[in-house]
């Protein structure tokens, strides 16, 4: 009979530390994706690792209310509250999409007390890409 090989550093022996507690990033990037149906706010560190995120759906808004400016404002406030507690002071803002929550999310970010380096619109624009559908004849 062979003896089982002892596991070195198994989960029971080692202490698992969460990444959220160790994050002390003074600078971050706030990504706002505003579609017509929802607004998603993601806060990352400069390397692109997600520190915090929130959306209008996770804030409790259902159906068509997720696309409203108030829902976007609430989502931005929830996402930023967590990183302000961790010590974030400066941020860059990237806004993507045509939704109603663009301006409301930006106002909530400005009100949170984080200093903004710049605000950039990164909405993808086609350079005459796909052919549009044919015109409707009614």
Swiss-Prot record:
Q: Which GO molecular function entries does the Swiss-Prot or TrEMBL record give?
A: rRNA binding; structural constituent of ribosome
Which GO cellular component does the record give, naming just one? Answer: chloroplast
Q: Which GO terms describe its biological process?
A: translation
UniProt-annotated location(s):
Plastid, Chloroplast
Return any one Pfam family short name: Ribosomal_S11
Magnesium among keywords: no
Compositional bias per record (Basic residues), positions renumbered to this chain: 9-22
Read off the InterPro entries from this record: Ribosomal_uS11, Ribosomal_uS11_bac-type, Ribosomal_uS11_CS, Ribosomal_uS11_sf
Query: Could you name the domain of life of the organism this protein comes from?
Result: Eukaryota
Stored Gene3D superfamilies: Ribosomal protein S11 (3.30.420.80)
Region (Disordered) residue ranges read 1-22
Q: Which UniProt keywords apply?
A: Chloroplast, Plastid, Ribonucleoprotein, Ribosomal protein, RNA-binding, rRNA-binding
- Spell out the disulfide connections: none
Q: How does it assemble?
A: Part of the 30S ribosomal subunit.
Q: Which family does it belong to?
A: Belongs to the universal ribosomal protein uS11 family.
Q: What is this protein called?
A: Small ribosomal subunit protein uS11c
Recorded source organism is Nymphaea alba (White water-lily)
